[in-house]
Design a protein with these regions (language model features):
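Short, flexible domain-boundary/linker segments around small modular repeats
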Residues: 54-72, 159-162, 191-196
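Individual alpha-helical transmembrane segments in multi-pass integral membrane proteins
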Residues: 38-52, 74-134, 138-145, 171-181, ...
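Membrane-helix boundary elements
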Residues: 25-40, 152-175
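Short, strongly hydrophobic alpha-helical membrane anchors
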Residues: 1-37
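Helix-loop junctions on the outward
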Residues: 24-31, 65-68, 88-106, 223-235
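Membrane-interfacial loop-to-transmembrane alpha-helix junctions, especially the N-terminal start
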Residues: 66-82, 139-148, 201-210
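C-terminal transmembrane-bundle signature of multipass membrane proteins
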Residues: 54-57, 90, 110, 114-123, ...
Length: 265
């Protein structure tokens, strides 16, 4: 990430603390990798993601209120959490640019977004399975322990990096975790899209808008595996900014879908 002075490091620290020094807090522009162009693009990307995430959470909350009694509450709550946590991630990214705050655990927050998206995709399939598959409920009960393990991975990454810094082991766990979470979500997405009985339904349409968000959001924390492999961290951060923009773009189309769905309720 960046040093307290705002200069991007070429290799990840292995033992330095992750949250920076509160005593040296300053408000002002802090360049990423001493690169004004990268800093500007990153700032725009984070502001864009924050604005879209707030809107996404807003429409998820409205859909939840409009769907009371329909059995879709958990799905809308998952999507509301996606928007809320993505907003936190984006705002932290903005603060890293306009203040001396250094939240090296930031990508761990996006890892939580990836997990929430995967669980939302699972919930889409779960809701459809209850209406088309009598065995759907019992199948999902056996997955709770696995999902709790996923939550534990997110906690280890966020709090581990916050306390210990960008250790290679934690970056590896973050990257692998993102890929595993995405695989979990895409497993249910594939099963959903292959089910002829639910094709063309609201749930099917929503799923097809969520999968691109899941794919692009996964790449942001997953690309840190390149850091572990020895790629210059400045290059990795350039890639992460690109993937943040792609995530925001995909989330915007999903937000439009939530707004359209609200009009049909």
């Amino acid at each position: 990430m960046t040093t307290p002075s705002g200069t991007e490091t070429g290799t990840p620290p292995t033992a330095a603390g992750g949250v920076g020094s509160v005593a040296e807090f300053e408000v002002g522009l802090h360049l990423l990798a001493d690169d004004p162009s990268l800093t500007f693009v990153a700032f725009v990307a984070m502001v864009l993601l924050a604005a879209i995430s707030v809107r996404f959470a807003f429409y998820a909350a409205r859909n939840r209120r409009a769907s009371v009694g329909t059995g879709d509450g958990v799905l809308w709550e998952s999507l509301l959490a996606v928007g809320a946590v993505a907003t936190v991630y984006a705002l932290v990214g903005v603060l890293e640019i306009v203040t001396s705050i250094r939240a090296t655990f930031k990508q761990g927050v996006l890892l939580a977004v990836v997990l929430l998206l995967a669980l939302a995709v699972r919930e889409v399939y779960y809701n459809a399975a209850l209406s088309t598959d009598a065995e759907g409920r019992s199948e999902f009960r056996g997955r709770r322990a696995l999902e709790l393990a996923f939550v534990a991975v997110v906690a280890v990454v966020v709090f581990g990096i916050a306390a210990l810094g960008l250790r290679r082991e934690l970056l590896a766990l973050q990257g692998v975790g993102a890929l595993v979470f995405a695989g979990y979500g895409f497993h249910f997405g594939r099963r959903q899209t292959a089910a002829a009985m639910v094709q063309g339904t609201m749930l099917d349409s929503l799923l097809r808008h969520l999968l691109p968000v899941l794919a692009f959001a996964t790449l942001v924390p997953a690309v840190d595996l390149a850091t572990v492999a020895g790629l210059d961290r400045v290059v990795v951060i350039h890639l992460q900014v690109v993937f943040v923009i792609m995530t925001a773009t995909a989330l915007m189309t999903a937000t439009i879908k939530l707004r359209q769905n609200l009009a049909t309720l």
